[in-house]
């Protein structure tokens, strides 16, 4: 099953490092919550810890919005555990509160379209899945550029706003900014203000 915006997100079950322990985790465990699933290439690398730590340090902001963060790479759970035991000053991710999925058979990365087949690693994909399991947003970066936590939060806020209010969020929308109903009349009114 391929990842397609507007369709159910590909389901998965895998081992994951959760609160310092290896456990089985399924996407369905989070039904009823929004999920931001973000892929990264490898543990013990360079841009990856900056992203993971940035998301981890702001995890409460996502939880307050009813959203679960999930980090995923093709590394094993034991590799995740070893990396989690290395201090941040030494390039590790000690103190992770975000489940780290171990996609060792590459199925999740392949299903979400981020697997670099000949290298066996994932591109930097970020997927917003709503509380009904529908994929709402896909962003995929090449390896050398990290993602923005602020933009992930903005997109999450926008999708939750549109789901709740039935209005659309224009370009560069921020929480509290003007929105409008998806109609020609409301668009004209919005554009003239």
Curated annotation (Swiss-Prot):
The active site is at residue 48. It catalyses: a hydroperoxide + [thioredoxin]-dithiol = an alcohol + [thioredoxin]-disulfide + H2O. Gene3D superfamilies: Glutaredoxin. One of its GO terms (biological process) is cell redox homeostasis. It is an enzyme of class 1 (oxidoreductase). GO terms for molecular function: thioredoxin peroxidase activity. SUPFAM superfamilies: Thioredoxin-like. Its EC number is 1.11.1.24. InterPro entries: AhpC/TSA, Peroxiredoxin, Peroxiredoxin_AhpC-typ, Peroxiredoxin_C, Thioredoxin-like_sf, Thioredoxin_domain. Keywords: Antioxidant, Disulfide bond, Oxidoreductase, Peroxidase, Redox-active center. Residues 3-161 form the Thioredoxin domain. It comes from the Eukaryota. Homodimer; disulfide-linked, upon oxidation. Thiol-specific peroxidase that catalyzes the reduction of hydrogen peroxide and organic hydroperoxides to water and alcohols, respectively. Plays a role in cell protection against oxidative stress by detoxifying peroxides and as sensor of hydrogen peroxide-mediated signaling events. This is Thioredoxin peroxidase. It comes from Echinococcus granulosus.
